Structures are given as structure tokens and as C-alpha cells.
């Protein structure tokens, strides 16, 4: 899988509200209404990530969950990261 160009990443981010680029990764922080809502979302996303063998870095801080996506084997952002960002958005309903 090939790394995406800066132009491809910027174009994709235009359709992914809340996501930002940080170096070689995509990042989104989401604040949930309650701690367990965030945990529930993480569980659903983890199940999907396992099924596609592409795993996000996840940081949980009370009601705020931060997702960081990068294709480590390629050294940057690929289509797999964009697809996972879209799935995360669907799973969290935003």
C-alpha cells in the first residue's frame, strides 16, 4: 500500500470534519457525554480494527477519547487510515 501525497491527504481531510494531520498521522479527539459512552465506542472501533487488521492508537482521558491513525508498516498515512477514520466517524455517530 502506497503512502498518500500531501494533496491527497488534504483533500481527504476536507471530508473528515474533526480530523487533523499531525506529521505522519491523522488525529481526532472526541468528547463523549459520559465515560462509559467513550469506552463503548472504543470497544466497537477495536472490534472493527481487529477485523481489518489495522489498529489505531487510542488514548482515553475521562470522557475524551483521542484516535491517532498511521500505517506504521508504510511509515505514514495510507488509504487504510482514511477508511478507518471514516469508520470511526460512523461508529461514534459524528
Curated annotation (Swiss-Prot):
Family statement drawn from the similarity comment of this UniProt entry: Belongs to the pterin-4-alpha-carbinolamine dehydratase family.
Listed InterPro entries: PCD_sf, Pterin_deHydtase
Molecular function (Gene Ontology), one example: 4-alpha-hydroxytetrahydrobiopterin dehydratase activity
The organism's place on the tree of life at top rank: Bacteria
Protein name according to UniProt: Putative pterin-4-alpha-carbinolamine dehydratase
EC number: 4.2.1.96
PANTHER family in the cross-refs: PTERIN-4-ALPHA-CARBINOLAMINE DEHYDRATASE
GO biological process, one term: tetrahydrobiopterin biosynthetic process
CDD domains for this protein: PCD_DCoH (cd00488)
Keywords: Lyase
Reactions accelerated catalytically: (4aS,6R)-4a-hydroxy-L-erythro-5,6,7,8-tetrahydrobiopterin = (6R)-L-erythro-6,7-dihydrobiopterin + H2O
Transmembrane region(s): none
Lineage, highest ranks first: Bacteria, Bacillati, Actinomycetota, Actinomycetes, Mycobacteriales
Amino acid at each position: 500500500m502506497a503512502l498518500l501525497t500531501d494533496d491527497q491527504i488534504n483533500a481527504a481531510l476536507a471530508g473528515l470534519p474533526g480530523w487533523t494531520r499531525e506529521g505522519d498521522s491523522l488525529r481526532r479527539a472526541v468528547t463523549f457525554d459520559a465515560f462509559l459512552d467513550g469506552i463503548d465506542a472504543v470497544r466497537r472501533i477495536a472490534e472493527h480494527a481487529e477485523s481489518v487488521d489495522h489498529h489505531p492508537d487510542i488514548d482515553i482521558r475521562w470522557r475524551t477519547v483521542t484516535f491517532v491513525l498511521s500505517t506504521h508498516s508504510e511509515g505514514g498515512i495510507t488509504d487504510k487510515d482514511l477508511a478507518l477514520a471514516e469508520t470511526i466517524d460512523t461508529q461514534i455517530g459524528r
